Amino acid sequence: KILQPLKFKIISTGSEFTKDHFILPTNGYYLNNFIKKNNHIVEKNIHIKDDQKLLLKEINNSKSDITVIIGGTGKSKDDINFENFNLIIDGLDLKPGRPFKLFIKKNKIYMFFPGNPCSSFVLTNIIIKSLIEIYNNRKSQIKYDLIDINNVKFNFKILKRKSFLFGLRDQKSIKVFNNQESSNLKNILYANCLIYYDRTNKLRLYQIND
């Protein structure tokens, strides 16, 4: 059986995305390229201001298999009112990416990513990649290497919850970057792997090829 490509709609939110600002919706650009590189379709990739009515209209009008809304997952007055949605997932025990949310309506998936670039990057490389892997190959998870925590030099005790950490892997060792703050965009630029810590003695290492 030949599978049809998944169809995505990307909605970036934020009133900072205007012609008068130098801020660009790079999360949406990255996700758009990631989806296409994995041989699926982006039907629409739009950027809208912080407007609840406009966002609801775009969500309700979506005919794509998967709609990803980026930004507006915080608790300020301009952020999304999630009482309008019947959420299946309302946050993750995870850093970065804790504000992630999801609901399903009429067999279509709607996901909310935080606007923070590091969070969006991790969720794209783990959740979107996992969905594509399940759809393409009927596999329940993406490939990873299992690493003993004692073989990696990093103070994992400082982590308060399950975490994806940016790192660099070469032939000899695995280096976890010291500054794992979600505002540190250098991690995205220099990392070639994500290391998942789930409070056990085994780490999962996911290679980043994008």
How should these model regions be labeled?
Residues 1-70:
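Phosphate-binding glycine-rich loops and their immediate beta-loop-alpha structural context
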Residues 7-10, 65-67, 108-112, 174-175, ...:
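Structural motif
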Residues 11-15, 27, 48, 70-73, ...:
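Fold-independent oxyanion-binding glycine-rich loops
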Residues 58-103, 114:
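Glycine-rich phosphate-binding loop
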Residues 78, 96, 101-147:
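Anionic-ligand-binding alpha/beta catalytic cores of soluble enzymes and soluble regulatory domains
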Residues 142-210:
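C-terminal terminal segments
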